[in-house]
Amino acid sequence: MAHAELATEQTLLREIGRTERNRRHIRGWLAVVLFALFALVLVGGATRLTESGLSITEWKPVHGVIPPLSAQEWEEEFRLYQRIPQYEQINKGMTVDDFKTIFWWEWAHRLLARGIGVIFALPLFFFWVTGRVERRLRLPLLAILALGGLQGFIGWWMVSSGLAERTAVSQYRLATHLTIACVIFAACMWIYRGLCPHSDDAPPTKASQKMAAVIAIFSLFQIYLGAIVAGLDAGLSYNTWPLMDGAIVPGGLFVQQPAWINLFENPKTVQFVHRLGAYLLLALVLWHMIAALRSAPETTHARRSVLLFALVVVQAAIGITTLLLQVPIGWGVLHQGGALVVLGFAIAHWRGFVGAYPKDTAIEVRA
């Protein structure tokens, strides 16, 4: 009996060790995916700010990997761009060399997106067939893969909105594209954090745990609002702070009918709502930090809440600076990257309350 118990214990320890090794491999893979997704969002922001997103007017998922390689191919690509309203109304007179600048931004964005599909799908397949993917992770990882495929279609759906009548993409489709990218990033972060070792600190209160979830979800919503701002160039509506046109609440916020359409199509209203969202997020993380410090000042949860507050303050400062400088490209990209950092940490913070995935220690003992 003692020998059987010892053998079972040794088998259990080996199984736990194998699970931990597999988790380290999965974490390493997801860390690479997260880094690539972060880079993709930054390149996407630069593509938008340089008005490069409509430079490639066709969607070729496979052949589009190869850029123009000869002068003739560049001329042909440029002729395609000259057919769309953006060229006729904004960039008429652009040279081929000028066109190459905006082309490379969009091409790099698409290439990086394709690359992420590869670095997600191939390792997932390998980990799956070698038994390294825990059963509880299979459906979430497949859902992320499917969402990534859908995101490719959404990207082209967004671009196509600016090829016929508009000189820029639809703000609705831009917001959808960015939000889905952030959902994919958040989902990868949630799984990554769930596979990391956690502290044994109990959550300060149930309310703190719920507030961590609210903050994470609202951070994503604030990114959606920011995408609407970007799609309308609403960041140029008012370039003063803290007042807007000399007032806390400026006029002309609801001049369009029906009134709700102003929330999506009136640049002044859109910027005002995005500002309010930033103030509300700052208030939420401040309240959350104070509550955590009062309830359990020495816990990792409290320390994370302090860091989250600091990140939101820095992001707010970046946003204000971007606004006052009238949205220069560098600051605009930094602001978009900062939003993703806040979202990622908010997700990790929330997951810290929930805890790590339990390890499967069930051992089948055969006679």
Curated annotation (Swiss-Prot):
Membrane-crossing residue ranges in chain numbering: 26-46, 111-131, 139-159, 174-194, 212-232, 272-292, 305-325, 327-347
GO molecular function: metal ion binding; oxidoreductase activity, acting on NAD(P)H, heme protein as acceptor
Topology term for the membrane: Multi-pass membrane protein
Chain positions recorded as heme binding sites: H274, H335
Record carries keyword Cell membrane: yes
Keywords carried by this UniProt record: Cell membrane, Heme biosynthesis, Iron, Membrane, Metal-binding, Oxidoreductase, Transmembrane, Transmembrane helix
Claim: Metal-binding is one of the keywords in the record: yes
EC annotation from Swiss-Prot or TrEMBL: 1.17.99.9
Chief place of localization: membrane
Cofactors (names): heme b
Pfam families linked to this entry: COX15-CtaA
GO biological process per UniProt: heme A biosynthetic process; respiratory electron transport chain
Entries under InterPro entries matching the protein: COX15/CtaA_fam, Di-haem_cyt_TM, HemeA_Synthase_type2
Cellular location(s): Cell membrane
Pathway involvement of the protein, from the record: Porphyrin-containing compound metabolism; heme A biosynthesis; heme A from heme O: step 1/1
Gene Ontology cellular-component annotations: plasma membrane
Catalysed transformations (reactions): Fe(II)-heme o + 2 A + H2O = Fe(II)-heme a + 2 AH2
UniProt record similarity statement: Belongs to the COX15/CtaA family. Type 2 subfamily.
Subunit structure: Interacts with CtaB.
Function of the molecule: Catalyzes the conversion of heme O to heme A by two successive hydroxylations of the methyl group at C8. The first hydroxylation forms heme I, the second hydroxylation results in an unstable dihydroxymethyl group, which spontaneously dehydrates, resulting in the formyl group of heme A.
Protein name: Heme A synthase
